[in-house]
Amino acid sequence: MKHLLSISDLSKDEIVGLLDEADRFKEVLEGREVKKLPTLRGRTIFTLFYENSTRTRSSFETAGKWMSADVINISASSSSVKKGESLKDTGLTLSAIGADAIIMRHPASGAAQQLAQFVAPGGNGPSVINAGDGSHQHPTQALLDALTIRQRTGRIEGLKVVIVGDCLHSRVVRSNVDLLSTLGAEVVLVAPPTLLPIGVENWPVRFSYDMDAEIADADVVMMLRVQQERMQGGFFPSHREYATLYGMSKEREARLKDSAIIMHPGPMLRGMEINFQVADAPRTAVLQQVSNGVHMRMAILFALVAGSDATI
């Protein structure tokens, strides 16, 4: 595996292998006062973010540093991108400096694929990891979500996973649908008609407008943020109506199965898609998702950058 651009880049065995590797990193680091491994010593990793990020960027940086890599952060707002430099020239510059991997977030769907073609023609050059491209894909988020589900429930195959919210603009939902369906979960999308993707009837999912009917027997309920920054018009009448119909209220949380878990890729809009208290409830796995993000991204960097003879 040279790049990680989309969940479709991975076979089922490769997905399971990354989940297992992330669990191994967690086990190795647990209880260590100094969280440092020599695995990527001498490697140089650039994070190149054209959009804001807290969880993804900081967890990739932490993952690289815990593996002894040199991690250099590039923000579009403070780089030559601000002067009009193209994605191609930015990528080639980082490659010429000596990048072993470039982790990129970009507002344009397909940008990660383009960058990989620019910097690694014929497979020679740095690895590219997609940290989110427009509303297209966010493969590392789907992998850490799957890791969290497996840790909480012991399995993924046969589970009913209900994803609620802005499915139209979400790159997270696309990656999760690809991954969870590959691993044998039943995936149901719940959203108002205006926030379901075009062509969703061809996806390996069911879709519904009725949240209460679908979450009653769900094993996992994943709430999505309403991405107002990607909306040009009115997709629903009001925030209050949206919260009433599609928010995870205390009443809805109380009606879930005892074993059901609640997830959210973040950032959360408390009081809109999820109740303030529900966000902190024991069955809510949000902070576990965040901590798993570091271990999963360590596993990804290990697979792409460390080399075939490397050991943890």
From Swiss-Prot:
Keyword terms, alphabetized: Pyrimidine biosynthesis, Transferase
Residues binding carbamoyl phosphate, per UniProt: R55, T56, R105, H138, Q141, G266, P267
Ranges in coiled-coil conformation: none
GO terms of molecular function: amino acid binding; aspartate carbamoyltransferase activity
Enzyme Commission numbers on file: 2.1.3.2
PANTHER family noted in UniProt: ASPARTATE CARBAMOYLTRANSFERASE, ORNITHINE CARBAMOYLTRANSFERASE, MITOCHONDRIAL
Protein name: Aspartate carbamoyltransferase catalytic subunit
Protein source organism: Corynebacterium glutamicum (strain ATCC 13032 / DSM 20300 / JCM 1318 / BCRC 11384 / CCUG 27702 / LMG 3730 / NBRC 12168 / NCIMB 10025 / NRRL B-2784 / 534)
Gene: pyrB
